[in-house]
């Protein structure tokens, strides 16, 4: 338990009696996910004392943060990244997406399992494994986790120069990222791989958290629903700002279905550049359209990997254009 002066109030709060008993582990998360246990605010506050002012008692006599507050969520992420991944500096500009780290970690771990399934059950690790993060954003979450857990090398792309500027600062301030994360701007907002992948460039996997709304209004309506569930309807006048996310992060023409369908079509022109192309799919109703696009693109193999965080279910779709013989040759050469 914390004992030094600034946390005295927090210490008293965290020892309140009649606290609600919560499960010790979050259900559904990947077995290797470092965030399976409930947030240990004692430990997080030691790693990142800046978190302490954002801690407050809940109605159940527990300690937490206000998850409707972008500053509180950002500070929680900063503490998690420092405590679990050794990231000394991490910051994002106002209004940029501040992603939930446990869910992002699940994607990385399931992606590792996907690679292992093609490598005799052994997860390929180290700098020989190259991963392309489409839409790395200002937060660099996937490269941070992938580098720390598996030693992978990343290229992160984004169309927003402000996001890349913030990401470059994170890289420059953390030695573990300097030689393992390369950042590239996608200058054509209609392209995904074109202009990024060189002819002879090879990636073992791609990952992407696509913009899933079809308009700014749809994104705002979703955020209002989230705020209402948190009992924060009074702050819904500025919905996007409360949860974070620039327009390019939250929505695009055609929404999730349109974006991933374009990704599938473009990936077919880069069939030999990557072993597994993958993308998160937030809406289950999007899947039939994506499967149709993959059939049209003549993908050799398609997998859907389900993930869960409590009652929330998500998934990512993975596809490859490599034949079994080409997959075996890739494994022998790179892993």
UniProtKB/Swiss-Prot annotation:
- Give a GO biological-process term: rRNA base methylation
Under Pfam families, the record lists: Methyltransf_10
The record's subcellular locations are: Cytoplasm
**Secretion signal span:** none
- So what EC number does this one have? 2.1.1.181
This protein's GO cellular component annotations are: cytoplasm
Write down the InterPro entries for this protein, in alphabetical order.
METTL16/RlmF, rRNA_lsu_MeTfrase_F, SAM-dependent_MTases_sf
Instruction: Provide the alphabetized UniProt keywords.
Output: Cytoplasm, Methyltransferase, rRNA processing, S-adenosyl-L-methionine, Transferase
State the reactions this protein catalyses: adenosine(1618) in 23S rRNA + S-adenosyl-L-methionine = N(6)-methyladenosine(1618) in 23S rRNA + S-adenosyl-L-homocysteine + H(+)
- Entry superkingdom: Bacteria
Q: Which molecular-function annotations from GO does this UniProt entry contain?
A: 23S rRNA (adenine(1618)-N(6))-methyltransferase activity
Q: Which family does it belong to?
A: Belongs to the methyltransferase superfamily. METTL16/RlmF family.
- Job description of the protein: Specifically methylates the adenine in position 1618 of 23S rRNA.
PANTHER family xref list: RNA N6-ADENOSINE-METHYLTRANSFERASE METTL16 (PTHR13393:SF0), SAM-DEPENDENT METHYLTRANSFERASE (PTHR13393)
User: Could you tell me what this protein is called?
Assistant: Ribosomal RNA large subunit methyltransferase F
**What is the source species?**
Yersinia enterocolitica serotype O:8 / biotype 1B (strain NCTC 13174 / 8081)
Lineage runs:
Bacteria, Pseudomonadati, Pseudomonadota, Gammaproteobacteria, Enterobacterales
Primary gene name: rlmF
